[in-house]
Structures are given as C-alpha cells and as structure tokens.
Amino acid sequence: MADPSTYRPAPGTIPDAPGVYRFHDAEGRVIYVGKAKSLRSRLSSYFADLSGLHPRTRQMVTTATGVRWTVVGTEVEALQLEYSWIKEYDPRFNVRYRDDKSYPVLAVTLHEDFPRLYVTRGPRRKGVRYFGPYAHAWAIRETLDMLLRVFPARTCSAGVFKRHSQIGRPCLLGYIGKCSAPCVGRVDADEHRRIVEDFCDFFAGRTDTLIRKLDREMRQASEELEFERAARLRDDLEALRRAMEKQAVVLGDGTDADVIAFADDELAAAVQVFHIRGGRVRGQRGWVIDKVEETGTAALAERFLTQFYGEQAALAEQADAGGTPVPREVLVPELPPECEAITEWLSGLRGGRVAVRVPQRGDKRALMETVERNAKEAFTQYKLRRAGDLTARSAALQELQDALGLDTAPLRIECIDVSHVQGTDVVASLVVFEDGVPRKSEYRRFAVREGAEGGDVGSIAEVVRRRFARYLKETAPPQEGGNGSAGATAAVENGSTDTVAANGSVGTAAGNGSAHTAAGNGLADTAAGEPEADVAVTPQEAERTGIDPETGRPRKFAYPPNLLVIDGGAPQANAAADALTELGITDVAVIGIAKRLEEVWLPDEAEPVILPRTSEALYLLQRVRDAAHDFAIRYHRQKRSKRMKSSTLDSIPGLGEARRTALLKHFGSLRRLRQATVEEISAVPGFGQRTAETVHAALAAGGGTGESRDNAEGESQ
C-alpha cells in the first residue's frame, strides 16, 4: 500500500476553486472521482491522519499513488464533469448503485409497423418505449392481460406474427378478442397504432381523458340502440377501472413525482424510489451502495440524483421513443448541498422546470414515510446477505493464498476454458474475477486458430500466448524516438503534451512543467505535486502502464492476473505455464481445476492439491470455472449456429447482411427465393435490375445446397 504523503500535493499548488478530482493507482487506473466547491479544502481532507478517515476512504488513499484535478467555472459544470468521468472510468471506489434485482418493465415497440406489447427484463433498445419498472412480473402481466380487452394490440413475437400472416388465421388471442389480429388484416397499420397509442396514454397516466371518451361513446351507442357495442364499451370501462384500482391513488392532485428515501449506516446505504405518475404509483426500484467516505443523507441524495437521472436520460436518448426521464417534482428526505445546481441540471435534462423538495406534511409526507420503511426493510435484508458474502469472499481468497503458497491473496483471477464439438468451431473464453466478484466488462472470447489441431492442450496454449502477448505489447516501455519495444505499439506523441480534449486551456503539472488540456470550456487540468516519476501520465508513461494515451483509459489486456485458472487437469495447466515461460512471464500463478473430482493441479506437480469440499476457496474456483464454461459454450453455440446458417447468399458479391435479411424476409425461405424470377427479386426494396440478375444467377449456379462456411472471428474485444 502507498503512503499518501508520497503523493500529497505541494502546499499552495491546489487551487481554492470548484472542480473535479480523480485519484489513480500505480497502473494509471482511475480509482475514485469526486467534485468539490473548493478543491483545496476537499483534497486536504484526504491527507489528514489516516486513523480519522472512513474505512473505505482510508483504503482508497492508500491504494492510490497520485491525484489530479480539473478546475471548472461553475458547480453545474463540476456536476456534469463528475458524472461523465464516473461513467467513463467506472472507478472502483466510487458509489455504485446495484439493483436488488432486475426489475421487469413493460415494453412497446413503437419502431415496428405493428407495435408489440411485452414484459421484459432485458436491455433498453432504440425505438422502444418502456413503462415501469415494476416490483413483480406477475402483477404487470396480469394487468396487461386485463387491458388487452380494451386495447387489443399485438403481443406476439415476430416469428409468430409472420407464421399466422402466412397461414391466414389469427392466434387464440385474436379469436377471443384480446388481439385486433393485424397479422390477417382485421385492422390496418394506422388503426393498430391508434390502439397502441391509447394504451401508452393510459400507462402514462392520462386515464381520465380515456375514461371520459369511452363513457361518452358508450352512452352514444346506447342512444343509437347499438346495445352490443354499448355493452362491450361498458365492459371495457369496467376493465380499466379494475386496472386502476391495482394502482392506488397516493397523491390526489394527479402529481408526477419521484419519491426517494434512504436507509444507511457508516459503510453502506440503501435507496428506494417510487415513481408516481398521475397521482398513482407506476413503478418502484431499489439499490444498495457502498460508501467511500462519511456521507450524510443530503450528500447521498445529490449523488443519487446525478447518477440515476443521468443514466435515465442516456437510456431515453438511446431508446429514442419519447417521454422524459425526469418528472416535474422530485421528493427527497433532505435537500442536496448544491440544490440549485442539481435543480438546474435536472431541468436541463427534462427540458422544463423541475422542483426538488422535502415533503413536510400531508399525503406527500405520508408517502415519503412509506418509501423510507421500504428502504429500511431492503437495507436490513441486504446486510444479512452481505455479512455472509463478504466473510465468504475474504475467507476464499485467504484460503487460496495459503493452499497454493501465493505471496499475496489472488485479488484478480482469470480463467480460460475451451469449447468445441469433436474439434469443430473451437473457441475459448476468458473470464475475470476481482475481489471474488465477476468483472463482466473484462470478459473476453477467442476463436482458436492453429492451436485447435493440438486439442484442448494446444488450444489452451494458443489462448494463453495471445492473451499475454497482448499484455506485453500494451505495457512495453517505449524506445527512444517514441517506438515501443518487443512489438509494442508506437508511442502516439513525442514530448510531454497530454491532450485530454480540446479547448485551449492549459494547466501546469506541479514539479514537471508538462502541459495538459482538459475537457470542457476553459477547464484547467492539473496534476498534483507528486514525485518526478509519478506526475501526469505522458504518452510514454501511458505505454508503460497500459493506459491509452489518446483516451486515458486502460487498454483491454493491460493488467495481469494474480492467478490464472485453467479448466482442465495437469496437461492443460502445464501447457499454460509453458506458454507463460516462453513469453518470459514468471509472476503469474497457474493452476488447473479438473472436473468430477475437483482436483487442483499445479504445473509440474505429480500430485494435485485437494481442497476440502466445504471450503470457500473451492467454491470460488468452481464459480470462476463455471462462469468461463458458460461463457465459452454460449460463444461456441453462436459460432456454430452462424456457420450452419451460412448459405449460397453469403458468397454473392455486393450482398451484405442487410440485403440478405431483406431477401429472406420478403420470400420467407431460401427455397422460395430460388424459385423467384429476376423481376420478383428486383421488386424487393433496395434491389435494382443488375443486383437481381446477380442474385438469380448465383442461386441458379449454386443448385439446391450451397456449402456452409466457417467464418472465424478471431478475438472479440
């Protein structure tokens, strides 16, 4: 661990101005990002007596080897820059909001000709509008089933929709009145979209207008003696009212608001959010965070508002499906310290005025108390789980260190597994665990090349060589003149200019004199008064430390593991160790874990290490091995499926994936496409006469088969 005094900024070098600061470790990774009204006051607090610091803060400052800062003009700029850097660098010591679970949402595919309604937990997609999240999937599915009577929109997948279009008969929902059956032309695209838009209006909280409209139509139908239509509208009204009863009115004035509450102790905190739209609870979410420093409720509120609404705005922009991520009102237990800056920033995201308030009395105060009770309950459950989890992970790492005779606990573990079927479509996976927790953003996969001929042993050796050759390449020191050694990439620049972004403001690194240009409008980016070898990262230092000098971010293979786990026995472990020896790497421990008996093999050892069946170390190794196994199998299946689906179309020049998809979608199958004439092919959008003739000739020459091809992908990064 580093002594904070070795990189403490020299007296007088830290400006007394608002700004954003970032601590980095010996490899140049940013490990913490923070902002302050006064950089001098805030940074000085980190270099006080270590015994008086929060445990996580103490761990952070002793892990760091340097600190840099950026001066900004306003607190809003500091807020924006802090959020951007946290999102970019993903610092390990910053507050991380982790969902207690993946909450279900209701999705509406507005980008399709016939929009579909469905419940999902998956990633957000462009052109899809989302409602929720909801606490229980069964509840939203029950509500959706009830509302399909009123809004008979499509809920089937693209495959089911296409199949029923071809056979000319609707599915069961079409027969029982819960789908308008656009697949067989009962309604056209415009009419179906109106149904979907009414559904979206209802879920967005505009219920009164819809109910008045249906009530008016029901009375009109009754007056015109259309009793069947009036009865159907009456049933629709009843279904709507039943659905609304499931969402109790909590704020009688039709308020749109998010109600946020916290429960915390000195090490962690839980946050709960109730999303109120039109006075009704439309969604609920919960997170748990690890505190880095002694943080009160007001500071927690500020950080949560910044991260949560920043991410929601990014998702809304990505989905491009309308709606605003920020409500008119945000209710919090305590106002953030920089409430005006937060309010201004939120108003910018919304495109209209946003009020951040603390409810004092009435319904809003009662609702806040309800959310606080939920937060306390969630926090209690989290602490019960976390107590066992932290203890188990710490014990597992210590047991591994002792059993394998390692110098330090293996804080970073990598595992390699190979997957194939009888030597075909040979692929490998590499998974990463840090502090006993999967680091999925650093998972990698490999398409095995020449090593496949040597079976699992040859494949393992190839993957190890490729992974660690990249590590050596990305961390090799540069030669004179800016050229890296041992196959390293050439240095990006000569001299000592570190360009973070462009705007012409320059700040001087203490004790070095190298210039730095920071992001934003006139932001001065300054490195702390550190020793000569640990000042701002120049392009040459970046090459040595594995930091990309253009982006300032770690390269993909820049950090070696403390322990390399191979899914296999002694032969596989020996192959991995030999590959490392060839590369001159001697500081990475290698083991193999054999299936069935769960034996741990060390290279060149005649007997395995037997870990107790109930040990936390064995359980951790099994988790790592299983994660690599699952990741490899998924890639193998994907690669095999791609090869099996390859056809004559793949070899036609000028025919890309989009055009191939358009052809198959238009004709339904390759067989029907072969039977098509040139004129029929040219009728497909995007196909001219010449392209149609090329396709027709290629299919005629290819006959009825068309050999499959294996498209090797190399490393997927």
From Swiss-Prot:
Presence of the UniProt keyword Phosphoprotein in the record: no
Span list, region Disordered: 517-555, 696-717
Keywords: Cytoplasm, DNA damage, DNA excision, DNA repair, Excision nuclease, SOS response
A GO cellular component annotation in the UniProt record: cytoplasm
Domain UVR: 208-243
Domain annotation GIY-YIG: ranges: 16-95
A GO BP entry: SOS response
Localization per record: Cytoplasm
Main location per the UniProt record: cytoplasm
Stored InterPro entries: GIY-YIG_endonuc (IPR000305), GIY-YIG_endonuc_sf (IPR035901), GIY-YIG_UvrC_Cho (IPR047296), Hlx-hairpin-Hlx_DNA-bd_motif (IPR003583), RuvA_2-like (IPR010994), UVR_dom (IPR001943), UVR_dom_sf (IPR036876), UvrABC_protein_C (IPR050066)
Sequence ranges of Basic and acidic residues compositional bias: 541-553, 707-717
SMART domains: GIYc (SM00465), HhH1 (SM00278)
GO molecular function: DNA binding; excinuclease ABC activity
Similarity comment: family membership: Belongs to the UvrC family.
General function of this protein: The UvrABC repair system catalyzes the recognition and processing of DNA lesions. UvrC both incises the 5' and 3' sides of the lesion. The N-terminal half is responsible for the 3' incision and the C-terminal half is responsible for the 5' incision.
The protein's assembly and partners: Interacts with UvrB in an incision complex.
HAMAP family per UniProt: UvrC
Name of the molecule in the record: UvrABC system protein C
UniProt source species: Saccharopolyspora erythraea (strain ATCC 11635 / DSM 40517 / JCM 4748 / NBRC 13426 / NCIMB 8594 / NRRL 2338)
Taxon lineage: Bacteria, Bacillati, Actinomycetota, Actinomycetes, Pseudonocardiales
